[in-house]
Design a protein with these regions (language model features):
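Alpha-helical segment proximal to the catalytic Tyr-Lys
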Residues: 14, 59-63, 128
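Residue(s) in the substrate-gating loop at a strand-loop-helix junction
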Residues: 29
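Short, flexible catalytic-loop segment of classical short-chain dehydrogenase/reductase
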Residues: 33, 73-83, 87
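Active-site loop-to-helix junction immediately N-terminal to the catalytic Tyr of the SDR YXXXK motif
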Residues: 36-44, 56, 84
Length: 153
């Protein structure tokens, strides 16, 4: 998760420096600096490192008109998620997907196209004043408190 992104950034920065502008979008995860799961310490560590890398590179290259941002994805309905669902429940693979979706405030997983549209926006001139940003795309999964004295909705 870290070495490949680092190498990709270094390779991408060279032509961007030459042309005088550019945008890099790093794919991170909500796992790491926002949430953590038992047994995923190494994954969480690497994804948190990507957030730090985003911020460090953003500061370093902002004056060169190069923007670096990161996305922090929750669950998306990708072929990988569908494969994991099939492996966990070969009889009814839709069940684990719905179990995850039911815990998301928006009651669904992200569509791959929604994630792609966020990447396209961050790479476009429409986001020209964003750098060093962490954009969470998780349907609100990281918003609720696990314990609350508030009212139920």
């Amino acid at each position: 998760n870290i070495k490949g992104v680092w190498n990709s950034c270094q390779a991408s920065l060279k032509p961007m420096l030459k042309q005088g502008y550019g945008s890099i979008v790093i794919a991170s995860s909500v796992t790491g600096d926002l949430v953590a799961d038992a047994g995923e310490a190494a994954y969480a560590m690497t994804k948190s490192a990507l957030v730090g890398l985003t911020k460090a590179l953003a500061v370093e290259y902002a004056h060169k008109n190069i923007r670096i941002n990161c996305t922090q994805l929750g669950y998306a309905r990708t072929p990988m998620v569908e494969k994991m669902a099939l492996e966990s429940n070969p009889i009814n693979p839709e069940e684990p997907i719905q179990d995850i979706a039911s815990a998301v405030p928006m009651k669904r997983l992200a569509k791959p196209t929604e994630v792609g549209e966020l990447f396209a926006f961050l790479g476009s001139d429409e986001s020209s004043y964003l750098t060093g940003s962490q954009i969470v795309i998780d349907g609100g999964s990281t918003l609720p408190e696990t314990l609350s004295m508030g009212t139920d909705h």
